[in-house]
C-alpha cells in the first residue's frame, strides 16, 4: 500500500483558517459506509442520525497553550512546543533553534522563568521548570495556542476558546481533538434528551499528529506515541450498549484510537498508558460502529484510518465530492458522519 494512494487535490482556499461563527455552524457530510452513499447536511442534523440508546464517546483532553518563546543564556532565540507533560516540573518538548541546546544549559523564557535542558530524547528535549512553579502554570500564563501549521497565522484571543472543546477537562493535549469542536452545550443537551448516552476517554493529542508519512510504503511508517486512558466505567457502558444492539459512535479519530487500542485482545478492557496504534485499510474494527470526524490531510495516517472504516473507494470518493461541493477542510473545517463498512477490511487497493 503506497502513501500516494491516499493523495487528493485540495484547493488552498478550502483550508479553514478560522472557525465558523458558531460551533454547530459547520456542514456535515454523511457517508453510509456499506453503500458509499452520500448526503449533504448541517452539523445540527447529527441529532437525527443517532438513536436512543446509542453511545457517543468523546475525548475529554484539553489543549494547553503549548508554544512559548525564549532565549538561551548565551543569547540565541528559540521556540518551544511542549509535546508531553512528564510531571509537575518537567516536559518533553520540540525546540526550534539555530543550534540545539545542550544538557545542563539554561533557557530563559519570555517572562524570565529559567528552564534547564536536562536531556535529549531523539527529536525531543526534556526541560525542567523551577521548583517554585509548575510547567502547566507557566504555559497557561505565557503560552500560545499551538495552532496547526496549515492554519498559517498567529494565534488570537478567540483561539483560546474555539481551539478547545466545551467538555475538555484533562489538560495535556498540544492539538485539539477537532471533531469535538462542533459540539456546544445545547447540542450535547439535546443528544442527552434524546436518550443518547455519553462517555469520555482521554487521549492527549501530540504534535506528531501533524507529522507526514514520509515513506512510500505505508507499512514502513513509524507511528508516534500518545498517552491515553479508557476507564472500566466506559468499558462497561460499551459492553452494555453492544448487548442492547445499539451503536458505539466515536467522536473523532482520537476516540477511535483509544477504543481500538483498548480492544486489541478482542474485548474492550480498561487501559492506561501509551498507544501507537496505526490503523490502515485491512484493519478489522472491534468496537466503533459510527464515526464523527473532520476532513484530514492528504496522505495522512488519519485519512488511512477513515479509509479502513468506510472503505478506501468510498472514502476517496467522498473526499472528491467534498472538494467539488466546497466543504471546509481540516481542524477548523466541516465534519463527516460515517457508518462502518464491515467489508472494508477485505477491500483490495489497486
Curated annotation (Swiss-Prot):
Per its UniProt entry, which superkingdom is the organism in? Answer: Bacteria
Its annotated pathway? Answer: tRNA modification; tRNA-queuosine biosynthesis
Listed SUPFAM superfamilies: QueA-like
Reaction it catalyzes: 7-aminomethyl-7-carbaguanosine(34) in tRNA + S-adenosyl-L-methionine = epoxyqueuosine(34) in tRNA + adenine + L-methionine + 2 H(+)
Q: Which UniProt keywords apply?
A: Cytoplasm, Queuosine biosynthesis, S-adenosyl-L-methionine, Transferase
Gene3D superfamilies per the record?
A: QueA-like
Q: Where in the cell is it found?
A: Cytoplasm
Please verify whether the record's keywords include Zinc: no
Q: Recorded E.C. number(s)?
A: 2.4.99.17
One cellular component term from this protein's GO annotations in UniProt? cytoplasm
BP GO terms, sorted: queuosine biosynthetic process; tRNA wobble guanine modification
Q: Which GO terms describe its molecular function?
A: S-adenosylmethionine:tRNA ribosyltransferase-isomerase activity
Transmembrane stretches in the record are none
Q: What family is this?
A: Belongs to the QueA family.
Outline the subunit composition: Monomer.
**Which PANTHER family is this protein grouped with?**
S-ADENOSYLMETHIONINE:TRNA RIBOSYLTRANSFERASE-ISOMERASE (PTHR30307:SF0)
Functionally, this protein is described as follows: Transfers and isomerizes the ribose moiety from AdoMet to the 7-aminomethyl group of 7-deazaguanine (preQ1-tRNA) to give epoxyqueuosine (oQ-tRNA).
- This chain belongs to the protein called S-adenosylmethionine:tRNA ribosyltransferase-isomerase
Amino acid at each position: 500500500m503506497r502513501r500516494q494512494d491516499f493523495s487528493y487535490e485540495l484547493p488552498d482556499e478550502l483550508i479553514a483558517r478560522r472557525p465558523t461563527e458558531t460551533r454547530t455552524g459547520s456542514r456535515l457530510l454523511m457517508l453510509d459506509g456499506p453503500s458509499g452513499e452520500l448526503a449533504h447536511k448541517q452539523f445540527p442534523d447529527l441529532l437525527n442520525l443517532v438513536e436512543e440508546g446509542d453511545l457517543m464517546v468523546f475525548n475529554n483532553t484539553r489543549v494547553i497553550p503549548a508554544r512559548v518563546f525564549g532565549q538561551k543564556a548565551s543569547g540565541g532565540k528559540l521556540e518551544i512546543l511542549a509535546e508531553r507533560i512528564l510531571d509537575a516540573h518537567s516536559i518533553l518538548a520540540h525546540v526550534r533553534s539555530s543550534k540545539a541546546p545542550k544538557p545542563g544549559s539554561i533557557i530563559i523564557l519570555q517572562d524570565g522563568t529559567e528552564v534547564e535542558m536536562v536531556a535529549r530524547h531523539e527529536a525531543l528535549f526534556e526541560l525542567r521548570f523551577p521548583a517554585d512553579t509548575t510547567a502547566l502554570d507557566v504555559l497557561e500564563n505565557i503560552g500560545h495556542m499551538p495552532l496547526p501549521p496549515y492554519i498559517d497565522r498567529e494565534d488570537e484571543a478567540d483561539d483560546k476558546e474555539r481551539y478547545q472543546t466545551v467538555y475538555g477537562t484533562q489538560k495535556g493535549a498540544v492539538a485539539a481533538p477537532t471533531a469535538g469542536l462542533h459540539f456546544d452545550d445545547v447540542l450535547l443537551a439535546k443528544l442527552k434528551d434524546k436518550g443518547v448516552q455519553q462517555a469520555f476517554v482521554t487521549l492527549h493529542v501530540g504534535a506528531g499528529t501533524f507529522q507526514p508519512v514520509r515513506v512510500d510504503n505505508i507499512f514502513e511508517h513509524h507511528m508516534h506515541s500518545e498517552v491515553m486512558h479508557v476507564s472500566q466505567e466506559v468499558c462497561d457502558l460499551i459492553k452494555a450498549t453492544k448487548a442492547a444492539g445499539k451503536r458505539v459512535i466515536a467522536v473523532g479519530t482520537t476516540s477511535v484510537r483509544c477504543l481500538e487500542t483498548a480492544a486489541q485482545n478482542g474485548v474492550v478492557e480498561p487501559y492506561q498508558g501509551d498507544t501507537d496504534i496505526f490503523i490502515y485499510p485491512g484493519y478489522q474494527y472491534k468496537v466503533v460502529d459510527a464515526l464523527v470526524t473532520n476532513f484530514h490531510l492528504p496522505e495522512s495516517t488519519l485519512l488511512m484510518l477513515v479509509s479502513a472504516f468506510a472503505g478506501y473507494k468510498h472514502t476517496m470518493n467522498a473526499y472528491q465530492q467534498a472538494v467539488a461541493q466546497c466543504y471546509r477542510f481540516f481542524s477548523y473545517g466541516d465534519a463527516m458522519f460515517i457508518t462502518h463498512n464491515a467489508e472494508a477490511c477485505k477491500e483490495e487497493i489497486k
